[in-house]
Regions:
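Helix-breaking motifs and short loop linkers at transmembrane-helix boundaries and internal kinks
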Residues: 46, 78, 99-104, 270, ...
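Conserved MFS/SLC helix-loop-helix module at the cytosolic interface between two early adjacent transmembrane helices
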Residues: 65-101
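Helix-to-loop junctions at the C-terminal end of transmembrane segments
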Residues: 66-78, 258-271
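Structural signature of the two symmetry-related core transmembrane helices
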Residues: 81-95, 176, 273-288
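Paired small-residue
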Residues: 93, 104-112, 296-304
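C-terminal membrane-cytosol helix-exit motif in multi-pass small-molecule transporters
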Residues: 176-195, 377-382
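Cytoplasmic helix-loop-helix junction between adjacent transmembrane helices
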Residues: 109-148
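Residue-level signature of mid-helix packing/kink "hotspots" within the transmembrane helices
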Residues: 60-68, 152-153, 255-260, 344-345
Length: 405
């Protein structure tokens, strides 16, 4: 009966819409600079493919180092302070991108963006799970990820449009304004009453162990995203498409469709099965892009890739949250999302090196290989969970057979 009551608890409330709206403005800001940074490095600063990979990926270096800390802070002091401070730091740092036409200066500003990104994402994503009934948590994560991937998908279209009309300086201003809007919306959010954390021996680790396995799979699967966002804006010139607008519009539209109409998929199939579907679709999409070097190949590959990217994050986060106490949600999100940062930071460097030696299609192929490797990670994670379950059941039997005096 309790389960029925929780399921009837409304999810799409004004409070939920406010935090998702803040997230969309924020990720639209990040998405706006996605096509601008590679082109700015290559055409204005004279950098090569490795420099592009570093400039794109270094944002996530600061984020990956900070996320576990801010996850613990969010569990102790609340989510709103992370949301507001993170978005504010991002707004200021993006405005600095064009202050000095220097690659080292840009890299420094990108690291600062990463620090703000870590705080905002952990605060907002954790508040989303705070607001959701347990049985609808996968659905809530899916709606939240509409904001994440919708912003990252449609932001590049806005960025390309602004570059064509007003140049790089205008892109930094537009992105900074969107991040500032996210901070304002975040200011009007309210904290959710949460279970009180109880100190348990062995649970004071910086990295939350429940999130490490699913996070490692996320890392492997999302290196494809690093290849897609870094090199599609440059690859379109090679195949005569001219602009990446249509590719990012296709990607964004499909992400929205899957996330909205397939929001219950992770809850229905479970995190592991949904993760398998996501990895399979991602692998197929990146393989098509790598082997079919035409406009049609890029568009067909994008369809499969978008479907996979839509499901991967909510499926694996649901898996991670199911392994941890309710009092550790912030810590789980912080640790889990660190692997997202790692995939985009280290992943951008990896695909940048591959692109320097094997071209942009080689970078897409690397994304396919890493996504396929995610199946191994899921299998290992499932095996370990079964082993722990068996050991727990055996201990329970022993305790029953030999009760304490």
């Amino acid at each position: 009966m309790a389960s029925v009551d929780r399921r009837r608890t409304p999810l799409l409330t004004p409070r939920f819409a406010l935090i998702v709206g803040s997230g969309f403005a924020y990720f639209l800001a990040l998405g706006t600079v996605l096509p601008a940074v590679p082109q700015y490095v290559k055409h204005r600063l004279g950098g090569g493919d490795v420099s592009v990979g570093v400039a794109v990926g270094v944002l996530f270096v600061g984020a990956v180092l900070l996320r576990p800390y801010v996850g613990r802070l969010g569990d102790r002091f609340g989510r709103r302070v992370l949301i507001v401070s993170g978005a504010t730091v991002v707004a200021v740092s993006v405005l600095l991108y064009g202050a000095v036409e220097s690659l080292p200066f840009l890299i420094g500003a990108r690291i600062l963006t990463g620090l703000g990104e870590a705080a905002f994402f952990v605060g907002a994503a954790t508040m989303v799970t705070d607001l959701a009934p347990v049985e609808r948590r996968g659905e809530a994560i899916s709606y939240w990820s509409v904001a994440v991937y919708g912003g990252l998908a449609f932001g590049p279209v806005l960025g390309e449009t602004v570059i064509d009309a007003r140049g790089y300086g205008a892109v930094w201003v537009v992105a900074g304004a969107l991040a500032a809007l996210a901070a304002v919306l975040g200011f009007f959010t309210r904290e959710v009453e949460r279970p009180v954390a109880v100190s348990v021996p062995g649970r004071g680790h910086l990295l939350n162990r429940a999130a490490i396995g699913p996070g490692a799979v996320l890392f492997s699967g999302l290196i494809a995203l690093a290849a897609f966002t870094a090199f599609v804006p440059l690859y379109v010139d090679d195949i005569g498409l001219g602009s990446a607008d249509v590719v990012f519009l296709l990607y964004g539209g499909l992400v929205l469709v899957v996330r909205i109409f397939g929001a219950r998929i992770p809850d229905t199939l479970g995190g592991r099965r949904s993760g398998v579907l996501a990895l399979a679709s991602t692998t197929i999409g990146m393989t098509v892009m790598a082997l079919w070097g035409t406009t049609a190949g890029l568009l067909v590959g994008t369809v499969f890739f978008a479907a996979g990217a839509s499901l991967l994050y909510p499926a694996l986060l649901l898996l991670a949250l199911g392994n941890a106490p309710e009092t550790e949600r912030g810590s789980v999100v912080g640790t889990f999302s660190s692997f997202f940062d790692l995939s985009q930071g280290l992943g951008s460097l990896i695909v940048g090196l591959v692109a320097a030696g094997g071209g942009y299609r080689g970078a897409f192929g690397a994304g396919a290989v890493f996504a396929a490797a995610g199946f191994v990670g899921l299998a290992v994670h499932a095996s370990r969970r079964r082993s722990r379950r068996v050991r727990t059941e055996e201990l329970g039997v022993l305790a029953t057979e030999h009760p304490a005096p």
